[in-house]
Amino acid sequence: RALGPLIPSRLFDQFFGEGLLEYDLLPLFSSTISPYYRQSLFRSVLESGISEVRSDREKFTIMLDVKHFSPEDLSVKIIDDFVEIHGKHSERQDDHGYISREFHRRYRLPSNVDQSAITCSLSSDGMLTFSGPKVQANMDPSHSERPIP
């Protein structure tokens, strides 16, 4: 569900094993702005992997931040009417120690997406873009009757 007319539908719960920083461990009352404001929560959402799904008349697009994965760590498949995106990398050292990450996302494709024309690309900044054009059904404008069950 969209959060507003200007913000498309997004999944904000994709942290992919981000490390904790010092201010993540501070109690709520340590904020100088307000005892009820916790900056790190909002910051974490903005800097985490975000999935965005867009569907308009012309195309269906999925954009997924996979910056922690190399192309060899990713798998994208179409199975029936679903696109499945899987990412997994073995244990690596980062700023906070050692970490391994794995995720699995499954999205339903609209029935009018041309599956034979789907493309998938990975940008240099780690944004995976999956896109497919929609086909228009051949409808006779003079005959618009449709039974409703």
UniProtKB/Swiss-Prot annotation:
Stored Pfam families: Crystallin, HSP20
Residues engaged in binding Zn(2+) 3: 143
Keywords (A to Z) from UniProt: Cytoplasm, Eye lens protein, Metal-binding, Nucleus, Zinc
MF terms in GO: metal ion binding; structural constituent of eye lens; unfolded protein binding
A single BP term in Gene Ontology: negative regulation of apoptotic process
Binding site for Zn(2+) 1: 89, 91
InterPro entries listed in its UniProt record: A-crystallin/Hsp20_dom, Alpha-crystallin/HSP_16, Alpha-crystallin/sHSP_animal, Alpha-crystallin_N, HSP20-like_chaperone
Subunit structure: Heteropolymer composed of three CRYAA and one CRYAB subunits. Inter-subunit bridging via zinc ions enhances stability, which is crucial as there is no protein turn over in the lens. Can also form homodimers and homotetramers (dimers of dimers) which serve as the building blocks of homooligomers. Within homooligomers, the zinc-binding motif is created from residues of 3 different molecules. His-89 and Glu-91 from one molecule are ligands of the zinc ion, and His-96 and His-143 residues from additional molecules complete the site with tetrahedral coordination geometry.
Protein name: Alpha-crystallin A chain
Organism from which the protein derives: Eudromia elegans
Lineage: Eukaryota, Metazoa, Chordata, Craniata, Vertebrata
